[in-house]
Amino acid sequence: FLFGTAPNAWLCAHAGAWQPGQRVLCVADGEGRNSVWLASRGLDVEAFDISDVGVAKARALAAEQGVSVNFAVSDCDAYAWTPGAYDGVAAIFVQFADPAMRARLFANLIRCLKPGGTLVLQGYTPKQLDYRTGGPPHVSHLYTQPMLREAFAELDIVELREYEAELAEGSGHCGHSALVGLVARRR
């Protein structure tokens, strides 16, 4: 598992925003570490990723953990974003998108939340290019607080902060990292 099987720490710290039985979407969920963990907490989880290999590994992880997740193979543009369908959306390190695709993706994250629904998002900041411990090599794919504040202006920002931390998320995210985390609620 490129990013390990344990859930992301930012997600763990903020998953209390969702209660058992609520519907949560995990965007670009890779090999399933976050969706499987959320399902183990009693959430009704849907997840998608562009990689059929990643989704196959996610399905195997869910079976191993004895949980049910509705997985789909899709890219972000082709995914069937249902307006107002989710109590929560988890977007953890969804940083493969250039600025135009990112704008479409962020609009869909907002649109698919129910009123009162919560978005939990984490990504790398441009300072991450100094550390090279994970993430994309393109500054245009990285996040800043002002970018996120502007992109999610129609949501109520619960928490938005840039910080540094040691990540140990498989070989894909390993070492000192420059991060930004967002928790926001749809009005």
Where are these regions (language model features)?
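A short acidic, Gly/Pro-enriched loop at the edge of an enzyme's catalytic core
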Residues: 79-88
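Conserved SAM-binding strand-loop segment of SAM-dependent methyltransferases
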Residues: 65-77
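A short, conserved alpha-helix within the catalytic core of class I
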Residues: 96-109
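Conserved SAM-binding loop
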Residues: 58-59
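Conserved alpha-helix/loop element of class I SAM-dependent methyltransferases that forms part
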Residues: 4-22
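Conserved beta-strand signature within the Rossmann-like core of class I S-adenosyl-L-methionine
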Residues: 116-124
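Short alpha-helix
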Residues: 140-161
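Conserved SAM/SAH-binding beta-strand->alpha-helix loop
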Residues: 51-53
